[in-house]
Amino acid sequence: MPERRFLVVRLGSLGDIVHTFPAVVALRESFPAAEIVWLTHPRWKLLVSSSGLASKIWTTETRSLASWKKIIGEIRDANFDTAIDYQGLWKSAAPAFLAGVRERIGFAPAAVREFGVPILYTEKVHANSSHVADQNGELSLRAGALAPVAEVHIQPPPVDDEAFLKYLSARGVDRYVVLSPGGGWRSKCWPPERFGTLCRMISDSLSLRCVVNYGPGEDDLPAKVRGSSSDTDPLLFNGELGPLMSLLRHAECVVGGDTGPLHLAVALGTPVVALFGPTNPARNGPYRGAKGAVATPRAAAIINSEDIVLRAPNVITTHARGNQPHPSMLEIQVDAVFEAVRRVVKGRS
C-alpha cells in the first residue's frame, strides 16, 4: 500500500504555527514514512524547517495572484491524499479546494474566524478541546493520527546559534532574562514602563541582565523600557527569526504577553512568565502538551511544571483588538511579575 501524502496548511503567524507543531508531530509519528508537505508564508519557512516535520516546505504570497496560481497547480500535480487546514481562513482553505484534493479536513463553523469557510472542506471537525493546540490535534486525529498531539523538539539554526553566543560573550553576558513588551495587539500588551521597572528589579535582586526583544513597528518600546529601568542598561534585540530563536533558547526566562515570541520560547524549552488579559490562557496560553497549565485556587496565576501565567481574576475574555493595554493588563502588578520571574529562575538553578 503506498504511503499517505498529506498537505498541511498553516500560513502564519508565529505563535499559531508553534501551536500547530504538536498536532503535526503526532501526524508524523503516526505516519513516519508519509510525505508531509507544509504550505506556509515565506516569512515562516525557517520556523517550519526547524521542526523537521515536513518532507517539503512550499510557500505562497497570499496577496499575489501569480503565486496563488502557481501553488494551486503544484498542489494539483502532487496528488495529495489529504489536505489539513489548521488555520480556518478562506486563504488557507481555498488552495486545496481549487486544486481538487480529495479529502480536505478543517474545523466546523463554530471554530473558524471567517464565515462560510467550512464549505470548502469534505471533513468538518467540531473541536471539543479548550486549547488551540489540542483543537489542532483533533484535525490530526480525523486524518488518522494515533494521538492528537506529541512533544515538539525545535532548535535554532546552528549558524545563528554560534553567532549569537559570540555576540553575548563579546558583551560579557552569561545569564539573562528576555523581556518582550510588544505584540500585534497593543490591548494584549503590558505597559513598557512596567517592563522597565521589572528590569531594574531583576538586575538589583537577581543580578541578571535583561534583553528587550521588539519587532517591526515597535521602535518606540525599547526607549520606554530603558527610560524606566534606571541605570540597568538592558540590551536591545530586533533580529531575524534565526537569531531570535537563539535569544529565546538560551534565556533563563522569557517575560511577555500572548505573543509569538513567548510561544516560540516555550517550544524551544525555555520557561516563561506569561502576562494575560483579554485573551484566555486556557485557550491560548503556554503549551507543553500533557504538562499544560492548570489554574490555582486563586485563579490569578496559572502554573505548570515550568511556566507561570498571570491574569487578573474575573476577566471577561475578548478578542477585540485595541491600541492601548486592556484594563485587565493594568491589574497585573510589577511585584507579582518579579516574584514569578524569581520563582522560575530559582527553579532552573
Over which residues does each language-model region extend?
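Catalytic machinery of carbohydrate-active enzymes
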Residues: 1-349
